[in-house]
Amino acid sequence: MKDTIVAQATPIGRGGVGILRISGPLAQEVAKEVLGKELKPRLANYLPFKDQDGTVLDQGIALFFKAPNSFTGEDVLELQGHGGQVILDILLKRILTIKGIRIARAGEFSEQAFLNDKLDLAQAEAIADLIDATSEQAARSALKSLQGEFSNKINQLVDSVIYLRTYVEAAIDFPDEEIDFLADGKIEGHLNDTIRQLNGVRKEAKQGAILREGMKVVIAGRPNAGKSSLLNALAGREAAIVTNIAGTTRDVLREHIHIDGMPLHIIDTAGLREASDEVEKIGIQRAWDEIEQADHVLLMIDSTEQTAEAFKTEWADFLAKLPQSIPVTVIRNKVDLSGEAEGLQELDGFTLIRLSAQTKVGVDLLREHLKKSMGYQSSTEGGFLARRRHLQALETAAEHLERGHIQLTQFFAGELLAEELRMVQNALSEITGQFTSDDLLGNIFSSFCIGK
């Protein structure tokens, strides 16, 4: 017989209510032994919880859910009693005296729900993300993922790929038919539509991953431009040493902050210039390492030294070296000295913000700009959350789709196109768990709470 599992569903410690959750074929047996009666499904019962000798341990509400109409898809019993940890421990010990019942592993309830097709893998991960959400928008986005919004987009992509595979493999299997599916343009048109659809989901998923994990923002610029002062202004404390000596910051400084609950990882770097000092050279190389891995770059410019219009010429080499996928916001600092007014404008395709890191004038404009860059919305609407593994799977799918497009348009190689499409389907199916290794499942569910 399959194991029946039990765990505390409420947080460890003192609380008003404490809940124990039991899932498996012996859930009704627990009800008979601890409550003294079988329970009707979906009916709340106020009953005493009894020890083996009939002594009352606690009293509270008992709920029974008959398989498959439960979270896990199995018989589920919930005992909702008083929230003292000692009481819950005694009741848990009592339940474990029943043969065939054991303590649940971390995330095992959600794992059973996944294995019993009550939710897919992306939805299961959304449970943990909902619990860990640090902002209202992250919570709403996690809920959308739990309700299947992300999964639906992935399933639509999988359906498109299956449609393509059907026609490609028909062209391979029936080469003598009058219609040449590979040459008539229909497959290429549908393939292009699928690529556009996938790129849209990739963009949303990247935004969702930033919302979940935080945006990596690197402050870059020449020495003494005010990078460390801006780090301190955003952090709300003296996280970095600030002096008038150019090159004070020689290593990478990191500060984790929240703006209205949105997580950001702010990184201050060494000033970018031609350096003869060996230590400073190392610091500049580390600065470039961070810049190339950033989600967003703040390019600090001293407003007392150059005009706003000159930055593109002055920083042409920097902008050329920077990966085009990384957004850059130009910060004209020290407006308290240059006499410029604080403000935000679009200039030559870049967002430019005028502020003073020293007096903090204009810093709130930057905060709002960073929030919007992370996908913050003041309305209750939002996207879905995504994880790094989702981004990797989508990236893999995109690479195979592009290769498939080349096989079709340049070589008319149906067999190779079919293989690339198969790899696309496998990569996408990893997200929802239709095609997933046991090791990956173990890693995902082991990060959950015990009672989830």
UniProtKB/Swiss-Prot annotation:
What keywords tag this UniProt record?
A: Cytoplasm, GTP-binding, Hydrolase, Magnesium, Metal-binding, Nucleotide-binding, Potassium, tRNA processing
Question: Which residues does K(+) bind?
Answer: 224, 243, 245, 248
Residues given in the record as (6S)-5-formyl-5,6,7,8-tetrahydrofolate binding sites: 21, 78, 118, 452
Q: Which InterPro entries match?
A: G_TrmE, GTP-bd, GTP-bd_TrmE_N, GTPase_MnmE, MnmE_dom2, MnmE_helical, P-loop_NTPase, Small_GTP-bd
Q: Please give an example of a GO cellular component term from this record.
A: cytosol
Taxonomy, superkingdom: Bacteria
A Gene Ontology annotation in the biological process aspect, one of them, is: tRNA methylation
Pfam families linked? MMR_HSR1, MnmE_helical, TrmE_N
**Where along the chain is GTP bound?**
224-229, 243-249, 268-271
State its Enzyme Commission number(s). 3.6.-.-
Which CDD domains does the UniProt entry name for this protein?
A: trmE (cd04164), TrmE_N (cd14858)
Binding residues for Mg(2+), per the UniProt record?
A: 228, 249
Name all TrmE-type G domain ranges.
214-375
Task: Kindly list the cofactors needed.
Answer: K(+)
An example of a GO molecular function for this protein is: metal ion binding
How the cofactor is bound: the record states: Binds 1 potassium ion per subunit.
Cellular location of this protein? Cytoplasm
Family to which this protein belongs: Belongs to the TRAFAC class TrmE-Era-EngA-EngB-Septin-like GTPase superfamily. TrmE GTPase family.
Q: What does this protein do?
A: Exhibits a very high intrinsic GTPase hydrolysis rate. Involved in the addition of a carboxymethylaminomethyl (cmnm) group at the wobble position (U34) of certain tRNAs, forming tRNA-cmnm(5)s(2)U34.
Q: Which PANTHER family match?
A: TRNA MODIFICATION GTPASE GTPBP3, TRNA MODIFICATION GTPASE GTPBP3, MITOCHONDRIAL
Protein name as it appears in the record: tRNA modification GTPase MnmE
Protein species of origin: Actinobacillus pleuropneumoniae serotype 5b (strain L20)
